[in-house]
Regions:
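Periplasmic/extracellular loop-to-transmembrane helix junction in inner-membrane transport proteins
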Residues: 33-74
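Transmembrane alpha-helical segments of polytopic membrane transport and secretion proteins
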Residues: 1-21, 240-253
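Glycine-rich helix-loop "coupling/hinge" segments at transmembrane-helix boundaries
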Residues: 118, 194-231, 250-253
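Short helix-to-coil transition segments within interhelical loops
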Residues: 147-153, 157-177, 217
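Generic hydrophobic transmembrane alpha-helix motif, especially the helices
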Residues: 102-138, 145-146
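C-terminal transmembrane helix and the adjacent membrane-cytosol boundary/short C-terminal tail
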Residues: 91, 148, 183, 225-253
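Transmembrane alpha-helices
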Residues: 129, 133, 166-198, 226, ...
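Transmembrane-helix boundary motif in ABC transporter permease subunits
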Residues: 72-101
């Protein structure tokens, strides 16, 4: 049975891989047959070549974006968890803040980036805050939702046992909300590298976003594609890490 499951998983993985390879082959063929200039559409081989020749520059800028992304995510996670716990313990605060937080999400995050750059300059801080703002809401809402939607039978059981609010939170609400919390975290990490990159587009001196803008200005689309692929790969890695962390925590909760 285990071997069959592994075979099925392998087959399921094979379809998207083959599709991706087919797209790459068609892309390469079309550009070469139509003789499309590199400044309009580079071939996959061009992108691989520039990734190797400009490796150091790409690597240095990737480290800057990673630094901003990770710090922004940690900040968002800490603030979201803290505020989520406060909102769970103090219902008045939840009633006051929750509607405001929901309405705040109608403001496009990209419109906030120029303000952050004006207020905090062109260094890392505005990019970190941009990532934090992008990650904060999905984490908070998922966490609060998880804390609120606890089976009433379990809550009644803890009341019968005369558990304090803190004991109920630690031993019931927090473990039961982990699944929802990780759903919010997964949404956040999907967009956080993009958020850092967009902030770098609008104002920065280093990072993948700055690298893209400079490459675009020089019509070096092979470099633009190379940096875009790095953003995608980083996002996928972060999603994978969240999935691993979720499995480990749920296994031991």
């Amino acid at each position: 049975m285990t071997n069959l499951k592994i075979t099925d998983k392998f087959k399921d993985s094979l379809y998207p891989i083959l599709t991706f390879l087919a797209i790459i082959i068609v892309w390469q063929a079309v550009v070469e047959i139509k003789d499309i200039p590199q400044y309009i559409l580079p071939t996959p081989i061009d992108i691989i070549k520039v990734s190797i020749t400009d490796y150091q520059n790409l690597f240095d800028n990737t480290l800057v974006t990673l630094y901003e992304t990770i710090l922004g995510f940690i900040l968002a996670l800490l603030v979201a968890l803290t505020l989520g716990i406060i909102m769970d313990f103090v219902s008045v605060i939840r009633k006051c803040l929750y509607p405001i937080l929901v309405v705040s999400q109608t403001i496009p995050t990209i419109t906030i980036a120029p303000l952050l750059i004006i207020w905090f300059g062109f260094e890392a801080l505005p990019k970190i805050l941009m990532v934090a703002l992008t990650c904060f809401f999905p984490i908070l809402i998922s966490f609060v939702d998880g804390l609120e939607n606890i089976d009433k039978d379990y809550l009644n059981l803890f009341k019968t046992m005369k558990s304090s609010k803190l004991q109920t939170f630690i031993h019931l609400k927090l473990p039961m909300s982990i699944d929802k919390l990780f759903s919010g975290i997964k949404i956040s990490v999907t967009y956080m590298v993009v958020a850092a990159t967009v902030a770098e587009w609008l104002g920065g001196t280093k990072g993948l976003g700055v690298y893209m803008v400079r490459a675009k200005s020089a019509y070096a689309l092979d470099k633009v594609f190379a940096s875009t692929i790095i953003v995608v790969v980083l996002s996928l890695i972060f999603v994978g890490l969240v999935n691993i962390a979720k499995k480990i925590i749920i296994k031991h909760k």
